[in-house]
């Protein structure tokens, strides 16, 4: 599980990321990033009911993505805030494709050390 200090949870933080963050796209999600914040890197995950009506499937997508971010956390620059807005195509993706997409978008955003 992603440590509490590395989670974004406040609605205000997500709104700020959407408004001020740099957007990176993938077939499975949009990723918004703000750099230059104080403290450790923090991440959030948004999977709306539009992606899947079933909470079990939405939670599964969040778990897969959280696990990959947690694996990459030691190599992520501190002071970054990022949020993943999951798209409908992610529900049909398999684990390796989704995990590779998370890794790829973080590399594209130069979030990895």
Whereabouts are the PLM-identified features?
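Positively charged, solvent-exposed patches that mediate nucleic-acid binding
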Residues: 1-113
């Amino acid at each position: 599980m992603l440590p509490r200090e590395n989670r974004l949870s406040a609605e205000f933080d997500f709104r700020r990321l959407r408004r001020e963050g740099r957007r990176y796209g993938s077939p499975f999600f949009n990723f918004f990033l703000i750099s230059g914040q104080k403290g450790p890197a923090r991440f959030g995950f948004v999977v709306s009911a539009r992606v899947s009506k079933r909470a079990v499937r939405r939670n599964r997508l969040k778990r897969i993505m959280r696990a990959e971010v947690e694996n990459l956390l030691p190599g992520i620059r501190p002071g970054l805030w990022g949020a993943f807005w999951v798209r409908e195509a992610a529900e049909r993706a398999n684990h390796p494709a989704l995990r590779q997409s998370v890794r790829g978008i973080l590399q594209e955003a130069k979030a990895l050390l």
